[in-house]
């Protein structure tokens, strides 16, 4: 079954030293490489900073562009991974293994469109 892991930015990204960030990003890179190699990760992307987002608001045939993220949130999504695992428990275990010091990983099942 496929799930999306939504990866939020952690405080460490703003607070850690450059050396610590480099080490953490190295661990994250190894995590992605491991799960890409065994076929668990179907695709994954790092999102650019929230200030780069443009939101299209649709309203009964008209649209408005807003130069900001869809949601004004303290915790911004920093990336996502689509994973193919047997069940929710496996997806949760994968999320628990994500190597960042703090932050959140939302696990959500997906349906094909």
Language model region names:
Residues 1-113:
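Conserved, structured core segments of small domains
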């Amino acid at each position: 079954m496929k799930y999306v892991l939504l990866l939020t930015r952690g405080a460490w990204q703003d607070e850690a030293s450059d050396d610590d960030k480099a080490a953490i990003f190295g661990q994250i890179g190894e995590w992605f490489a491991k799960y890409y190699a065994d076929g668990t990760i179907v695709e994954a992307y790092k999102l650019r900073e929230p200030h780069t987002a443009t939101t299209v608001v649709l309203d009964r045939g008209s649209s408005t562009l807003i130069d900001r993220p869809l949601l004004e949130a303290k915790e911004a999504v920093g990336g996502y991974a689509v994973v193919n695992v047997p069940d929710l428990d496996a997806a949760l275990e994968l999320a628990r293994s994500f190597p960042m010091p703090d932050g959140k990983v939302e696990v959500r099942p997906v349906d094909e469109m």
